[in-house]
Amino acid sequence: IVFLILLKKEENQLEVIIKKNRIINDLKKDNYTLYYQPIVDFKHNRVRSVEALLRLRKDGKLLTPYHFMKDIEDANMMKEITLWVLKRVIKDYNIIRCYDNINEKDFYISLNVSFNEIKDREFLKKIVKIVNDNKIIKNSICLEIVEKFVVGEIEKIQENINFLQDNGILIAIDDFGVEYSNLDLLKKIDSNIIKLDKFFADGINDSEISLKVIDFILDICRLSDKSIVIEGIEEKEQVDIIKTFLYEKIYIQGYYFSKPLDIKSLKAYTF
């Protein structure tokens, strides 16, 4: 039995090495790429920001993270990939901000980071160094934290968020409302942006509760001067309802306005 356990352990270790080498090879061959989904300021008919979304070119196909992210996690390569994304985002930022459809004054690009990454101060120092070394404009990069906060670690997370914000990096809480009904999180985590999960958008047409929840979160955002992005908007009726909310810092992301675009297609994007 002990022999079988050791054999299985060796097989698992070998599998991790194979996955890691494959990922490193894909990085070297530039098989990873970024697509950008516009976040729209419908009040001023402009692109407020874009979210960077990782894709992998493989065997003539363009794969979403659903098909390759587990391998990255298994190989313990998430942080390396995040730093690669950040460097590519900074490179692309200087191109995208000059597009005619972009308001370059306060334009930013967001990228996703995990809860484990945002806990790691040494890793965050690497992020800050990359941003500072590239002399990127303050508040041009936003880190989106998926809302899976561990209650006992919120104080440490807020300290790390303060560190990032002090270095000119915006913070967004992504998928807000999924993991918690915990609106107390808005008080404890001082983010710049709240991204409201698609769950609320799906019910906005026919659910009074969804409308009330959004209205309530908007009130909190007004008081704390946070921006809010409503995700997953796919229908005109949803947009029309959102337009009735009286708040200057409300923005929309979803397929109604645009699917994720490569950097060249983004230049020609209009809505």
Place the predicted regions along the sequence by residue:
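Charged helix-capping and loop-helix junction motifs
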Residues: 125-128, 156-159, 208-215
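EAL-family c-di-GMP phosphodiesterase catalytic domain
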Residues: 1, 11-12, 42, 115-119, ...
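Catalytic-site-adjacent helices and loops of nucleotide signaling machinery
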Residues: 16, 61-65, 74-75, 82, ...
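Active-site core of bacterial EAL-family cyclic-dinucleotide phosphodiesterase domains
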Residues: 12-71, 173, 258-260
